[in-house]
Amino acid sequence: MCSILGSKIIDISKYGIIFSSLSKNLGISGSTLVIGRKDILSRPKLINPPIVMDWQPYIHLQGPTPTIMSIYMTNMNIKRMIKRGGITYYNSLTFAKSQLFYNFIDNSNDFYINDIPKENRSRTNITFTVKNSIHLSKLFCETAKQHNFIGTQYHPSNPNKGCRISLYNGLELSEVKLFIQFMKTFQNKFNFNDLQNSSLSS
């Protein structure tokens, strides 16, 4: 949920409780956002819940000292988001960025491969491999870093699955276009070298 909060229109009435990190789009690390239905939050406790799941002290302003800096930074960021057009603006921006990226991958002649069904694809975290090769995917990430594009490797929990691009709110459409241009250059250079090697071997 933390990857889409602030970047996608969500009908929160469908949820009893939303429990999410503030990082990614809304703020910085260190705080958690809880959105809960009043009828759920006001229920008497039948058991002793874990402290992290007991929100009554916070509702009644009796909780421990909150992470002031994280909340302050989140407040500043949300004010900026509202000034730029709010959730409607960021919903459209995220959709445009993801569509642009997926269209490029899908039309790369299987050089860049995303094997997730289109109806299940994330608009925020896009994964792919280079020619379905972990070796080439790692080479891509290393080359991207040399060109000042950082954080293109897959999630640290599974680094051998290829590449990952996160299109959070902080990434502008122009920056996505710039990265796609790098991907085109990488692909063209690889295809050229591959063609040269084929010519030499023949």
Per-region residue spans from a language model:
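Short amphipathic alpha-helices in soluble, non-transmembrane regions
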Residues: 137-145, 178-184
